[in-house]
C-alpha cells in the first residue's frame, strides 16, 4: 500500500464535497494540496518502497471529463507485476504522483478553495477490543489515558474515543491540543514518552485489516469515515442510501426525490464504513451502527434474573451516591455560610482592600456598565461647572487637591481599613435600631424630601455589597476631613480612640470576626420558621459569653465612632456663609473632577450622594435611639420631635430638615441640581418608529456582524414579526440542545408540563438554601436520571468511561452496596470520618473522559447563552444586564433567590439596587416566562444542571467549584455569567437567527417602543410594563429613565398585574402554546364576533327598531328607503373592519367607494319640537331649580342637538359655560322616557383626560342623585349584555381606560345592541394635541365606528383643530362656538417676575380679590413639580402667610393624597385657601370660589393659559388672573410656543385680543365688550385699583352681586355688531344675564310642569316672538344665518374640505340655529327636505346613513396603507394570461397572450437593461432594490403568511407575475423612466 496514492485517492474523491480539513495517517492536518505534497516529501511514514514513478494517475483532462460525468477519480498504485512495456505504452497518460497532486491543486483551487478540502478520520470498530486484561502491559496506562479520552486497543493501536479515530502516537499531543483544545502543560512530557511505545499507525492497521472481497454488508475492523451522509426519506421508506461525497448525494436527492424536498431536510450526518471493491476499483460505503466494546475478554452470559438484579443494584447505588453527592454540596455550602466566621471576616477585609483602590471605577461601572458606548456629554459638564464652580473650589485647596480623596491613609493607629470595618459594624447596629422603630418614626427621617409622599421611611440596606460600598464612601469623607487642616480636632480624637479600642481588642486575642458576625447576623435570612439558625444563635450566645471582656471595647469603639460621625455629618451652617466654603462641597468638588481639572460625568457625581445622605440619616437615627436609651426623651413626645426647642429637634431633627442650611440640606439641594442636569439619554437618535410594528434602529458598528437587508443611513429595519421569528428560532435551537444534553431521552414523560402547576413554592420562605426544587419528589428523584442513563447505555458509557467495561462498573457499584450494608450493620461507624469523603467518593473512582466532559460543557454553555436571550426577550419588558447576571436559583446567606414558581410559570423576581436614589431599598420586579419556556428551563435545571455539577467535581475534585451550578441561573464555561458577556452574546444570537445584529441596548429600547404602540394598559398612573422596565409611566412618555418598587406592603394583586403584563407581551410576540389555564388573563378575543352571533343580535335590534314607536318626528316614513338603508348597514356590520390574512377582503375594501353615498343632514329652517324643548327645560329645573335658564343659545343648541342623536358636534363654550349639560340633560330625559319592563336605559360614554376631572364630575353627578354613573367599565365586561341588562346611565372614564382594545370591544357591543346613546369627549383639545395621550389618539378613530354620535367638548378649541378632528375621527362635525373665549369678569394681569417682591405681590392680589374672606380661594400654577415644591417651601417659611394653609396638587402624588388635598381646598369652611398645582389641576375642575389664579412662569401654549385662567370666577364674580413671567421664557424657552412669546414681547397687545385671535379667530379687545374688567394692557393700573378702573372706564372691579346660580347667569355679546347695551333681565327679546334666584332645587315631575312657566326668556314657546326677524337678531348680537343652509342644499364631505382649504368662510357650517331668509322664521331643528313639524325625516334612517359613511371612512384608513399593493395585485390577476412587456413596450398594440419568457420584445436580451450585447453578469445597470424579497420584489408586510417570503420558494403573486423583471423593463422605457425617477429617485434618470 502506498501512502501517496492513498492521499491522492482521498483528495480526488473528496476534493469537491467533504468540508473540513485533510488529515494524514500520521495525524497532521492540511487545508490545501500544496501542503500535502510538501508533507509527502518529508513524512517519516512514507513507504520506502514507494517511488514517485510508481504512482499512476489520470491526466487533468481526464479528471475534468470524469468530473462532469460525476465519477470519482481513481488513483491506484501500479501493480508489481506491471511489465515495463505496459508502463512504456502508457507513459503519455502517466504522471508522477507529485505532478498529479499539483495538477489537482491547480484545478480544484481555481474552482473553489473551500469545496475540495476534506477530513478523513480512521476509526476502529467494535471488534477492536480494549486491551484492559490484567496481564496486559497497557492496563495502568489505559487508566491514565482514559482521562484524556484515549485508549490503546488490542490491535496495538491508539484510538481517540471522542473523535472515534485512530491516531499516530507521535502526533497524539498535537491532536489533543489542536482538535480538543486541551492544555497539557506538565503532561506534555508524558505524551512525548508515549512515542517509545511500539504502536501501529493508521496505515498499518489499514493494511492489516482491509478486505479484498466483492461485497461486504459489514466488516469488523475496517476504517470508518465519520463525516458521511444519510438520506432521511430513503431511510424512512426502508430502502436507505448513504454516501460520503456531497455531489453524489445531491444528485441522488434530485434524481429520487425531485425538487419538492429541500436538501437540508434530507441530509443527516452518519458514520460510514469504507470497503475497497476489487472489481469496481472504488470504495463502497456502508452505515455503521456503532456499539462500543465492553471489556477486554468476552464476558460469560449471566442468567436473566441475576443480570436484572445486578442492574437494579447498580441503578440504586448510582441514585444513592448521587444523592449523597448533592447533600455534601449542600452541607458544605451551609457550613461555609454559617459556621466559618473567620472566612466571612476575611471576605469583608478582602472586599475592603479590593474596593478601596477602585471605588470610583466600580461606581462608574455600577451606574452605567449596561451602556454599550458612552458619548461625551459636554453640555452636561458645562452645566455642572456653571452651577457649582467646581474648578474655583478645588483651586482654593491647592495643587494637590486630588490627594485629599486618596484611599490610602495611615496616620498613627488611624487607618482606612479600620474605619471601614467599624463603619460596617456601625451600619448593622443602626439596622437593629431601625427594626425597633415604628413606621411613623422612620418616616420622620424622610419628611420634606422629593419622594417623601411615597417613602415608607428610613430602611435597612438589603445587600452586603451595598453596606460595604456605603461604608467606604462615609469613611472616605472622614479621611478627607482628617486631611484638612481646618477640620474639627474632635473627629481625629474620637477616631483615634475608636482605633485604639479596636487594637486593644485584637491584642487581647478575641475574635473580632465573631462580633461582626453577631452584629451582621441580623442581615441573614429573615422569618426563619424552620429554626435553621438556632445553632448559630446558640453559638453566638456562647461567643458572647466567652467574649464578655471585649463587650466594653466594642461598645467603646461604637460610641467613639458615633461621636466622630456626629461631628462630621450632624452639622449646621450659618446662612451667611458661602456654600462653596463648606467642607462637604469641597469634598464633592474633589470627587467630581478628574486630575486634569475637567468635570466627570453627571452620573458619576450623582453616585456620591446616596451614601452620604443615607449615612447622615442613619447617624441621626442612632442619636435618637441613644437619647431614648438614656431616657432623655420618651416615645410619648413624638409629636414634639420636630418642634423647635425640643430635645429631639435640637439633637436630631434640626440636622436633617430641609431649608436649615445643614449638611443634609446642602447634600439634598446639590443632588437635586445634579438630577435636574442629568437626563437619561433618549433613543430618538438610535431608534426611529415607522409604524406600530416597524422600527429603524442603529446597531453598534461591528465588522463581525455586517448589516444584511433593510438598511437606511446606517439604520436597520426591524419588524415586530421578526421578533417572533427570533424567539421561535432561538427556542427551536434550545429544544434541540436540550435533547442532545439529555441524550435523546423522553423528558416529556419524565417531567410533564403539568409539573409546573403541581409543584408548590413557599415564596415567603427565606431559609438558607431553600428553593422550590426541594418541594417535589419528582424533581429530587430526577437529579440522577442522566447519570443512570449514561451507565445504562453502552455507547454513552463508552464515550464517558472509555477504559471501563460494564463488568468494572457493576463491580464498583456493587462494592458500594456492600459497604452500605456493612455500615448499616455497624451504625456507630457511619460516616464519622469526613476526612475520607474524597477517597471514598465513588464518582472519583470512575475513569472519566475529559474530552467528553469538555464537549458536554460546551453544549451546556451554548444552551445557557440561548436561554439567557430567550428570557431577556420573552419575560416582559427587558431587564438590565447587571440584574440578570446575578439571578440565583436558591436562597443565599445575604441574598434571596430570583427563581420562583407562580401561576404555573417560572417567575423571575429580581432585585436591583442601582436606583436607590432617595429610597435606599431594593426594588423587586416580577417577570413571568411563557409556559413552553418555563417547562424547558425547569427540565434543564432538574436534569442537566446536577450532571454538570458532578462533571465539574470529577474534573477538579473541588466542591467549591460545584456551587456555581447549583446557585446561579446562567452558567457559561463553568462560571457565572460575567457582566460583559450579555453585550456579546445577544448580538451574536440575534445575528445567527435573523441576520440582524440586534444589540442588548437596542432591544431594550425597541421593546419599550412596541409596548407603547401595541399594548394598552387599563390604568392611569402606573403601568406594570413600565415597572418591569424599571421606570415610571411619566418617564416612559417623555424620557427613558429608571425607577422601581419594593416587595414590602404590596397589594394582593401585585403579582397578578405583573403576570398580566408579561402575558400581554408574550401575546404580542405570538408565542405559541402559551395558555393561561383560566388564570387572570382572558384569551384574546377576535375583533368581530362570529357572523351568526352578530346576525342574531342585528335581527333582534332591527326588530325592536321596526316595532318601536317614534317619540318625536314625522309619522310618515319612507319604509322602502329605510329598509334599504338598514340592509346596507347590516351587511356592513357583519363584515370585519380589516383582515390582513384575506386577499379577497382586501379587494373588497379597496373597491369600496370612499366618498359617503348617503346624504348628510344639516340644520334646517324648521321650528324645534316643543315637546323636546319642554323636556329640556324640565331637566334643567331638576338640576338647578325652577327659575334656572340656559345661559346662551349655543348652550341650548348643544343640549338640543345632543338629545336628537342625529349629528356629531363640537361644542366650544367658555370655562364655566355649562358644557356638561350637553350630555347630562339628554341622559336624564332618556332615562325618564324609557318604558318600564321593556327596554332598559341608554348609556352615555364620557371620556375625560385626568383622574381629578373624572372624580370631580362623578362627585357632582352623584350629589344630584338623578343619574347613575360609573368610573369602571371592567366590572361589566364578564356580564352578558342584553336589552334588559341593567347598566349605569353614564360611564365616566379616562382616555387610557376607555381607548383600549378590550374597552372598545365592550362599547362596540353596547352600540350593536342600540344602547349607546352618545360618545362625549371632554377637553377634546388635549386628546388631539397633547403627546401624553398619543397612544389613545391612535385608537380614537375607532370611536367613529360606534353606532352613536360623537360630541367633542372644550373651552379652548382653536379653529385649526376642527380639521384635525375631522381627519382623526373620519367624520364631519358641526361646530357650536361662543363668540369669545376670554371672560368678562376676569382681570388679566401681566407682570415680570421679581423674586424679592413676588410674595408681597401675591398677598396684595389676594387682598384685592378677598381670598382671605368667605370661601375665597387662590390657585398658583407652576410648570414643574420642582417649582411647586419651591413655592410651597417659600410660602411655608414666610411670615406673610403664617396663618394660611397651603396644599399642593401634582401628578406624582398618590390618588388618596390628591383627593384629600382637593377636598380640603374646596371645603368652604376649611382653612386651606391656596392650592399650588401643575397643569393637571387646570382641566375641568369646577369650584366657584376661586378668586385668584396665579401663573408662576409662562404657560406652554395659549390653550393651557385659557384652561388654567378659566378656573377663576366661575360664579361670574370679579376675579384676577395674574401671570408672572421671566424674560428668558418669553425669548429663549424651548417649551413655550412662539405665539405666547410674541404675545409677551408685544406690550401693546390686549389679552382678550390675543385669546380671541388664537381661540376664536376673531379680532376683539376689552373695549369691544359692553361690560368687562379691562386687562392690565388696556388699564393703567398695575394691580387693578378700584378707583382707577372705575374712574377711567366706568366699570366696577366687582360685578353686581348675584345669587349663586346653578349653572351660570351671564352672557357675552360681540360688540362688533352693535354698541347698544345688552337687554335687561325680564326682557324676553334677548338672552341676557338673568338673576335666577334659585328658590328650590327639588325635582319636579312632568305633571307639575303645567302649573309652572317652563320656558326661559331665551327660548320661548313662540319662536317668532322670541327672536323676531333678522333685524332684531342683528340688534341684539345674533349672527345673520340666512345664508347657512337652505332646503335641499347638500354638499359632500370632500366639497366641504375643499371650501375650507380655499378659505371660504365656513362659519355657516358651524352654526346650527338659523334664520329663515324669506319667512323670517327661526329654526333650530334639523331638516333635510320638505315638511314641517317634529322631525320631518326619520331620525333612524339618517343615523344609519351617517353610521355607514363613518364605517366606510374607517375602513378606508385601514386600506390606504396597502392600497398600492392591492391595486397591483388586482391588476396582475386580471391580466395574468397576457404579456405585460408588450404593453409597456408599445401600449397601442394589442396584448398578445404569451408568457413573459417567450415575449419577442425581451427575447435574448439582458434581464436588467434589456440590451442584447451582454448577459446579466456583465450588466452595468446599478439600480438595486433594498429591503425587498429578491425573488418577487415585495416587502415583508406585503407577503401573506403562506408565501414563504425571502426564500427561493417564494410563492407570492408578484413572483408569478414576474414583477421585478417588469419593473426593470419599465425603467428602460423612456415613457416610464421619468415618472419613476421623479417619484422615487429625486429626478435622477441615470443608470
Curated annotation (Swiss-Prot):
Residue stretches of biased makeup (Acidic residues): 360-372, 524-533
Task: Give positions of region: Disordered.
Answer: 329-372, 504-552, 1110-1135, 1613-1643
Show where the Helicase C-terminal domain sits: 1401-1559
Summarizing the function annotation, the protein's role is:
A probable ATP-dependent 3'-5' DNA helicase. Has a role in telomerase-independent telomere maintenance.
UniProt zinc finger (CCHC-type) residues? 1804-1821
Q: Where is the composition biased (Basic and acidic residues)?
A: 329-347, 1112-1131
Extent of Low complexity compositional bias = 540-549, 1626-1642
Domain (Helicase ATP-binding) ranges = 1200-1375
Q: Which gene encodes it?
A: tlh1
| Keywords, in A-Z order | ATP-binding, DNA-binding, Helicase, Hydrolase, Isomerase, Metal-binding, Nucleotide-binding, Zinc, Zinc-finger
InterPro entries, per the entry: DEAD/DEAH_box_helicase_dom, Helicase_ATP-bd, Helicase_C-like, P-loop_NTPase, Znf_CCHC
Organism placement in taxonomy: Eukaryota, Fungi, Dikarya, Ascomycota, Taphrinomycotina
What EC number is given for this enzyme?
5.6.2.4
Motif DEAH box is found at: 1322-1325
One GO BP on record is:
DNA repair
Give the family this protein belongs to, as stated in its UniProt record.
Belongs to the helicase family. RecQ subfamily.
Instruction: Write out the GO MF terms.
Output: 3'-5' DNA helicase activity; ATP binding; ATP hydrolysis activity; DNA binding; zinc ion binding
Q: So what does this thing catalyse?
A: Couples ATP hydrolysis with the unwinding of duplex DNA by translocating in the 3'-5' direction; ATP + H2O = ADP + phosphate + H(+)
One Pfam family hit: DEAD
Name assigned to this protein: ATP-dependent DNA helicase tlh1
A cellular component term (GO) from this record? cytoplasm
Q: What class of enzyme is it?
A: isomerase
Entry-linked SMART domains: DEXDc (SM00487), HELICc (SM00490)
Residues that bind ATP: 1213-1220, 1240-1247
